[in-house]
A protein has these predicted regions:
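Surface-exposed, low-hydrophobicity beta-strand/loop segments enriched in small/polar/acidic residues
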Residues: 1-135
Length: 135
């Protein structure tokens, strides 16, 4: 018997709206469960970012940097920056934004997103029943 497509794990987009602090540091992003493959991750600015000397961000779970040194300096509202470095998250974790800032951009609202697949087993094979052995 074929496995129904609706029973299989699928890629989904998870997101969280956060406000990046006005100074360099780590901002907690989306939560992902154990056994998750991250295919891509990134940031979307919800307002314009001022032009300062340096404003870069890493989207990371602490082990894998999914989007490395994406520039947010002078980014327009709704600018999407992404990285496509895949990574496996073995234990439940968060995908955070680590910023490097030189200047004073102020607090910046953003949407942190990731395309993920839960790769834990999702389907259990059917057990044999009497009708399968009668005939």
């Amino acid at each position: 018997m074929a496995i129904s497509q609706s029973l299989r794990n699928r890629a989904v987009v998870v997101e969280k709206f956060i406000t990046l602090a006005a100074t360099a540091g780590t901002n907690v992003g989306v939560s992902v469960p154990a056994g998750t493959l991250v295919l891509a991750a990134g940031i979307e600015t919800m307002s314009a970012v001022p032009d300062v000397s340096v404003y870069t961000a890493d989207v990371t779970d602490g082990s894998t940097i999914f989007a490395n040194d994406v520039s947010l300096d002078a980014a327009a509202k709704n600018t999407i920056r992404a990285g496509v470095t895949p990574g496996f998250v073995a234990a439940a974790d968060t995908i955070d934004v680590v910023t490097t800032i030189t200047g004073s951009p102020g607090a910046i609202p953003v949407r942190v997103w990731a395309v993920i697949i839960d790769v834990n087993g999702c389907v259990v094979p059917a057990a044999e029943v009497d009708r399968d052995t009668l005939a």
